[in-house]
């Protein structure tokens, strides 16, 4: 796997999280497979490679790839505006989180607790989602920059949906951190668009 492919997979995780947040906000729906992939990515502590974080394949990242392609192509007809906004916000929040050792310590302490809940209840159980959402609220939500999610208030006001959104945002920020770890940089999204798209299309159609 090339370094750019590693970066695109991690960035695909960020955009996948963004797409799922947008879908829950607007429809109240999310597939269990997509949700499980995102939640599972938070629990992988020693991955062999980037794909390993998402369960060993990128089947559940394809919607993220599509949203990323629409952003890189800059075609107003296909651009997914809200997912793009969420993805860029997650990349920004990851930078703020990286400077906060106190918050990183809280996350590091509570992820194993969530892992034990997963072993007891299963990855997509409401207790796991609630615990993961609460972890986001206790850490990322305390930062100055906040992600404003737009959608149907009836969906956003349901506690289970709110927990899913926060849990997925935490997973998206985990993917943003992974992207940085494999040398992803925001300037690439501006200056290396064509190069990224050339490598992204085979992943998108694979």
Swiss-Prot record:
Gene3D superfamilies per the UniProt record, alphabetical: HflD-like (1.10.3890.10)
Stored InterPro entries: HflD, HflD-like_sf
NCBIfam families xref list: PRK00218.1-2, PRK00218.1-3
Gene source species: Pseudomonas savastanoi pv. phaseolicola (strain 1448A / Race 6)
Cystine connections: none
Domain of life, source organism: Bacteria
UniProt record similarity statement: Belongs to the HflD family.
Main location: cytoplasm
Subcellular location: Cytoplasm; Cell inner membrane
Keywords, in A-Z order: Cell inner membrane, Cell membrane, Cytoplasm, Membrane
Topological type in the membrane: Peripheral membrane protein
A Gene Ontology cellular-component term: plasma membrane
Pfam family, one: DUF489
Gene transcribed to yield this protein: hflD
Protein name: High frequency lysogenization protein HflD homolog
């Amino acid at each position: 796997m090339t370094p750019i492919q590693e970066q695109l997979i991690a960035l695909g995780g960020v955009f996948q999280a963004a797409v799922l947040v947008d879908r829950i906000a607007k429809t109240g729906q999310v597939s269990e497979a997509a949700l499980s992939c995102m939640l599972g990515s938070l629990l992988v502590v020693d991955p062999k490679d980037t794909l390993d974080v998402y369960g060993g394949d990128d089947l559940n990242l394809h919607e993220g790839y599509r949203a990323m392609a629409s952003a890189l192509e800059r075609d107003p007809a296909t651009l997914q505006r809200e997912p793009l906004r969420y993805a860029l916000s997650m990349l920004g929040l990851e930078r703020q989180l990286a400077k906060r050792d106190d918050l990183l310590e809280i996350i590091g302490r509570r992820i194993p607790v969530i892992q034990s809940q997963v072993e007891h209840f299963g990855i997509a159980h409401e207790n796991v989602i609630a615990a993961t959402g609460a972890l986001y609220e206790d850490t990322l939500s305390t930062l100055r920059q906040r992600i404003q999610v737009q959608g149907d208030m009836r969906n956003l006001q349901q506690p289970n949906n709110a927990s899913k959104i926060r849990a997925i945002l935490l997973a998206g920020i985990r993917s943003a951190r992974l992207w940085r770890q494999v040398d992803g940089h925001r300037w690439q999204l501006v200056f290396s668009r064509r190069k990224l798209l050339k490598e992204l299309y085979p992943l998108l159609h694979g």
